[in-house]
Amino acid sequence: MGRLSTFTATEPIIRARLKKARDKHYKSGVLGLRAKPTWDGEAFTYEGTPVTVVACPSVLALWEAIDQRNPEQWTVVLTGVEDDDLGDTVLAHLLDGRLITPDPWDALRGNFSATTIEPALYRTHNDRAIANGLLTALSPDAYTPAPGGVLTRDHAMATIARDVLRIVKDVDVEIDSLAVLEWSRSQDVTEGLITLSASGGPELTAAFQSWLSERSGRLRKPVRALLAAERITDLVPLGVVAGLFDDSDGKSLGVFLGSHGLSDLDVEDLHSWYQNTRGLVTNSLNAQQQQAVLTTAASIVNELAINDAAAASELLPQGLDARLVQLSDAITDGLPNPLPAELDAALLSDVALRDIETHWINLQQHFLADRDHSCRAFGGAVRLARWLASPVAPAQGLKVSTERYVRVDSWVDTALVTARRGADQPIPAAALRAIIDVVLARRGQHDLSFAAALADAPTPPVQTIENVMHDLVIPIAKTSPTLLVVVDGLSMAATNDLVRSTQLEGWTELSANHDARRASALAVLPTLTQRSRCSLLCGELREGGDGPERSGFLSLLHTAQLEATGGVPDPIFHKKALDAVPSGAKLASDVRNAIADVTRQPLVAVVLNYVDDTLHHVDPGGTDWNLETITYLGPLLHAAKNAGRTVVITSDHGHIIEYGTSAKVTRANTYGQRAHGDFANLDPDREVVVKGPRVLTETNSVVLAVDENIRYGARNAGYHGGATPAEAVVPVVVLVAGELPEGASRVVGAEPPWWYAEPVKARDEPTVSSVKRPRKPAQDTLFDDDSEAVAALTNRLADNVVATRVFAEQLALAGRIVLQQAQIKSLLQTLVDNSAHEVTLAQAAAALGVATASVNGALMQAKRVLDVEGYEALRVGSGIVRLDVAVLKEQFGVSE
């Protein structure tokens, strides 16, 4: 008997030998392999030819296999019989006339089309196990020719990474730290590792893990440790946590390292791990993936009870919460307590405001700030703080009071709506409540002043709603086809947000009064729909519903010689007509056709009820007022733009919002929720009597609520009818798309000066905050900044950026763009000069020297130059352009 071979044949080994046979032009035959005479596998095919494997423990078994073979197929015999025992007759039936002793390395050489093998691949303990593991783990179509005919360790292991673990898909994609980070988050990473272990065996698995750790560069230590601990799926969230530590916090560091088997990592390893992870999270993952990673990382922090260390994080929610608390403390400490008698004096000191601004900038630099609703609320609070830090001049008379509301106090109301959306945590919520209370105290005085002026002006010295058609709309329609949009209940505060939304769609706001300012009108009193809207559309003081509005509007058109011709439907559309939208469309056919017909219908009016409806059914304070929010408004403006129409947006009255603080006051003879005729019951501190021809009651007099907390009926989401400017002053917004008409002037700087932070160069050196800040990580990060750095920004930054080699390369890479270097420099300078490093689209357009309608395209060109390698230095969104100065410096290699 011959000696029994200890080699076990596998399908990959057999396939490799069949390949060699095919290379010698064999198409079928008997392949004899010296191996254990055992076979547990199934029959298979090789390149379309069936393969039968037969275990042959004896010469007799060999003869049986030879006799029963199909000459058109492959027969593979596995035997341990020695050649001398076989005889020449048996050997003559075998390929090459002999038994072949398979070598797995030889099989791999053939599969990879290699002539030699790098020693680093096979000079290991039990190298045959690694070779067999490779043959077993790799699929038949995984093999690619070894470069230069040398099968290297890198080539073999990269094939495993690609074929078994799917770390990369393309053979040309290098496996590096980023690839490993991305792979660690894939859904099938655990399954892939199990498959590798089961098919490739422990020797190949260990060899591959060692190789993958080396390919991970600066991440080799954590990758090796987590692969060994079967926790590679935690590589990214743990990498986020790794950024929390330095040598000064040995306790937290020890807890982290000890809990995850990372004891051989030092601070430099953690720093590298964090930097690589941060790059992946901020630049490669979408918002949902980012949230998943950061939520997991935050859970790890909570489990390890290292929240103090996490307070300095620029990525983790704990870091955001800490910055919110710092800003909250700065606001609370800066507010006057108790309130002074003179509320129009500066209520915050310069020092307090600087401290607030410093913490606000720090908060905005946190990665999660843009998507956190608490941060958005504090955006409103910081604006309110700036307003409180500014002394307010007294407003004498209705004209000045109205101007103050349009230019300043309506923006206060806009910021109040934002701040009142609140924060989740107790300390930030208390800070918001504190500043809101101070603002309401000052705003309440302004409301009383406005109401008193309203009562003193039966014939108002301001634009009134019944004259808007005569004075503004009809003159515009005589020079340009016009769409009049009456948004019932639209307040000035909501308009501030709405106009910004229109600018994002390429609209430019024109000054109706040619004074570069937003126009307004005074509603009819009491400020109710059937009085004020009817008066608006009829062009005279009148009370009524849709019918009188229609007839009055058509009469106006006839008198102005703007009536529709050609038998088309009346060019005024209320809710019923607007709602007749055919399936698949966005506008009713009659509405769409009327807007498109600029020849026969020069002036078209539509009435939208959405805002007024929210006062009864929804939450106006939680609504973002934009073209998508207000039903039909977006499609209407789109149709108007296509038709080349000028758009006038106005309202019949504004509104105030219910925040759970109002109380019902019993009065007789009420008009809606905020007006009554019960003159015997008058609270002079909270109500005002108004009289005159514009008061559309039987006696031409009425009592109007001034205090926002008074209502005369059931609780709603909001109210109107009273004498606050939020209810009585309505917007008159004129919009054009494209070139400005001859003689027209755009609205410039509708926002008050405090809406954006004061330019850095105009401010004094900031003082150090008394609020204790969390310890920052030892390493510098892209988000590191402090008050000293902010104050040090000078005119040199823009000059230095455009002078760099990187800037020149970016210009070249950007290809054909219209923007010139001087325009980009001007934009940079404008952004740097603002301590918050942000401006409106209108301000950006001015800096770039382009029309507002073209600014989005210009900004996209600027981003192609300023955003280096995917790092976003210039951010554009929600009508705001923001510069990340830290990223700009980092990517262009400048210091100031």
Predicted regions and their residues:
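Short acidic, hydrophobic short linear motifs in intrinsically disordered regions
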Residues: 835-847
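Short amphipathic alpha-helical interaction segments
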Residues: 850-862
